[in-house]
Regions:
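An acidic, Gly/Ser/Thr/Pro-rich helix-cap/linker signature
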Residues: 31-131, 137-140
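Flexible, glycine-rich surface segments
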Residues: 226-344
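Sec-dependent signal peptide recognition
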Residues: 13-22
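Acidic/His-rich structured neighborhood in mature extracellular/periplasmic domains
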Residues: 109-275
Length: 435
């Protein structure tokens, strides 16, 4: 049925012995030092990613245990998994990248915003929109997510595929699953990345044509495609493709947008667009509703009292109007606002001023703001998406048909959200093209 514990131990010992042999040979090499050519520097940067012998041995032991567990639970031949991970290694630089900022670090909303809402990304966004306009409109109609929001997310994530990461995803997830840096939340973070590593393996297995459970057979599975999937590039956190989906999100929310029978978030813009729309829809995006409202200047003290950093919709819009944080119009669905009973939260975006004093910009986040937070758990990120979308022409206000507000007996004199977006885009297409 499955290999015995003795057999598993032999495999693990073989892998550890293999690592020790490679490192020993490297240490004993009599090859004279090579000049720092570009090729040699690139090679060194890869070789130096490996950790010390003891760390690599522990890494191999833990990885082997996980592969055995997956083999048993999914009936995947263990040898196939071991072959796919034979060259897996820890990446010390990644452990540094995931460390929390130092105690003296100050969050800076203005710097963050400037990094993402800038001419290069906006120009690329307009080009991406023009190249995919018809499909974006189709996805907007199907999902209710405005095209500008989808374009903004992909632009902020990777500049439409220009920056998708340069780490092998199996190395990233293995490193963070078994060698996460010493932080207070280390156990929870390691478990998260173990789960993502499992998801990666199952994702790659099915992408390569394998079935689950596999019934101890690789029949129908293309091993080349399986290994290629494990070795694909990712961010330092293991996110993949144009929209930077984690493996679990790919398995749960990614869709085949171009209809070629497979999901490819790295090379297919249509797959990326459709997948972002599907993710947002499944996480509660409300069609025709705004993302956030600015706080009234004279109500900043009131907003400060309610801001607690907890991403929960705690207050009604009516309550925020009564406190002077929002205007009456923002609680009027027929005038670009939302219904008074709609729930909201106070969003605080801190930054230091030129003198180093702490300042905060406040917004009222609505349901759709929180949906964006589900994509990337950061208030900075969510508000940047909203403002990037506005720079592309997104109208951050409600767009609801009159019959939905007043009932079917009233005259319809308002277009749907998708129709307005299409009309707006056609009318402003010349303006939106890059200079």
């Amino acid at each position: 049925m499955f290999n015995s514990q003795k057999s598993n131990t032999l495999r693990m010992n073989f892998r550890v012995s293999y690592i020790l042999l490679v490192l020993a040979l490297g240490a004993c090499s009599s090859t004279p030092p090579q000049p720092n050519t570009q090729a040699n520097i690139a090679q060194q940067s890869i070789v130096n990613q490996a950790d010390d012998v003891a760390t690599e041995a522990r890494f191999s032991e833990n990885l082997n245990a996980l592969l055995t567990q997956i083999s048993q639970s999914q009936e995947i031949p263990l040898q196939t998994l071991e072959t796919g991970f034979l060259d897996a290694k820890t990446i010390p630089s990644i452990r540094k990248l995931v460390l929390p900022p130092s105690g003296t670090f100050k969050k800076n909303w203005l710097v963050y915003r400037k990094r993402f809402i800038e001419p290069v990304r906006l120009k690329a966004g307009k080009v991406f929109w023009d190249e995919n306009q018809a499909f974006l409109s189709q996805v907007e109609q199907e999902s209710g997510v405005p095209a500008e929001i989808i374009v903004a997310i992909i632009g902020i994530e990777t500049i439409y595929g220009r920056q998708t990461g340069n780490f092998r995803v199996k190395d990233v997830l293995s490193t963070l699953a078994f060698s996460y840096p010493e932080t207070p939340n280390k156990p929870a973070r390691e478990q998260l990345f173990k789960d993502q590593l499992k998801e990666l393996i199952l994702m790659c297995w099915t992408e390569a044509g394998g079935k689950l459970p596999a019934k101890v057979s690789s029949q129908g599975m293309n091993s080349t495609r399986f290994n290629s999937c494990l070795n694909q590039n990712s961010s330092y956190a293991g996110a993949i493709g144009l929209p930077q989906f984690m493996p679990s999100s790919i398995r749960n929310y990614a869709v085949d947008g171009d209809g070629d029978g497979r999901i490819d978030l790295r090379q297919s813009p249509k797959d990326a667009i459709a997948s972002v729309g599907n993710f947002m829809k499944k996480h509660g995006w409300q069609a025709g509703m705004p993302v956030s409202f600015p706080v009234q200047t004279n109500a900043i003290p009131a907003a400060k009292e309610l801001a607690d950093g907890d991403p929960q919709l705690k207050y009604t819009v009516r309550e925020l109007i009564e406190k002077g944080i929002l205007t009456k119009q923002q609680g009027d669905l027929q005038n670009g606002g939302v219904e008074p009973q709609s729930k909201a939260l106070i969003v605080d975006l801190p930054y230091p001023d030129k003198d180093g004093s702490d300042q905060v910009q406040y917004f009222v986040g609505l349901n759709n703001f929180l949906t964006i937070v589900q994509y990337n758990r950061s208030y900075f990120y969510a508000q940047s998406v909203a403002e990037f979308a506005e720079a592309l022409g997104y109208q951050n206000q409600s767009v609801v048909p009159v019959e939905k507000i007043e009932g079917p007996t009233k005259t319809v004199n308002s277009k749907s959200a998708s129709e307005k977006t299409k009309s707006k885009k056609v009318n402003s297409k010349k303006k939106s093209k890059p200079a």
